[in-house]
Amino acid sequence: MKTLLLTLVVVTIVYLDLGYTTKCYNHQSTTPETTEICPDSGYFCYKSSWIDGREGRIERGCTFTCPELTPNGKYVYCCRRDKCNQ
């Protein structure tokens, strides 16, 4: 009986993936592609883009709250899946 209970607990942990953390891209527009693991499961991946002079800039990473859109021409995209901010 104890073995069955232990097996059910292990299977539950594996399928629920307790302690899951999100993996996000964190490179800027001019650097090679890199990723980071967000510190907690409540985090979003974000991608922020804007025009700086004549060049487009992109910033990526993890954030606990999705940044609000601002009227300064900055575009922000948030998501919660692994590497969804490419």
UniProtKB/Swiss-Prot annotation:
Primary localization class, coarse: secreted
GO molecular function: acetylcholine receptor inhibitor activity; ion channel regulator activity; toxin activity
The keyword Signal appears for this protein: yes
Chain segments annotated as transmembrane: none
Keywords of this entry: Acetylcholine receptor inhibiting toxin, Disulfide bond, Ion channel impairing toxin, Neurotoxin, Postsynaptic neurotoxin, Secreted, Signal, Toxin
One Gene Ontology CC term in the entry: extracellular region
Tissue: Expressed by the venom gland.
Subcellular location: Secreted
Gene3D superfamilies linked: CD59
Disulfide bonds: C24-C45, C38-C62, C66-C78, C79-C84
Record's signal peptide: 1-21
InterPro entries for the chain: Snake_3FTx, Snake_toxin-like_sf, Snake_toxin_con_site, Toxin_cobra-type
Function: Antagonist of muscle (alpha-1-beta-1-delta-epsilon/CHRNA1-CHRNB1-CHRND-CHRNE) and neuronal (alpha-7/CHRNA7, alpha-3-beta-2/CHRNA3-CHRNB2, alpha-4-beta-2/CHRNA4-CHRNB2) nicotinic acetylcholine receptors (nAChR). The highest affinity is for human alpha-7/CHRNA7 nAChRs (IC(50)=180 nM), compared to human alpha-1-beta-1-delta-epsilon/CHRNA1-CHRNB1-CHRND-CHRNE nAChR (IC(50)= 550 nM), alpha-3-beta-2/CHRNA3-CHRNB2 nAChR (IC(50)=500 nM), and alpha-4-beta-2/CHRNA4-CHRNB2 nAChR (IC(50)=2.6 uM).
Quaternary structure and partners: Homodimer; non-covalently linked.
Family, similarity comment: Belongs to the three-finger toxin family. Short-chain subfamily. Orphan group VIII (haditoxin) sub-subfamily.
Name of the protein this chain belongs to: Haditoxin
Species: Ophiophagus hannah
Phylogenetic lineage: Eukaryota, Metazoa, Chordata, Craniata, Vertebrata
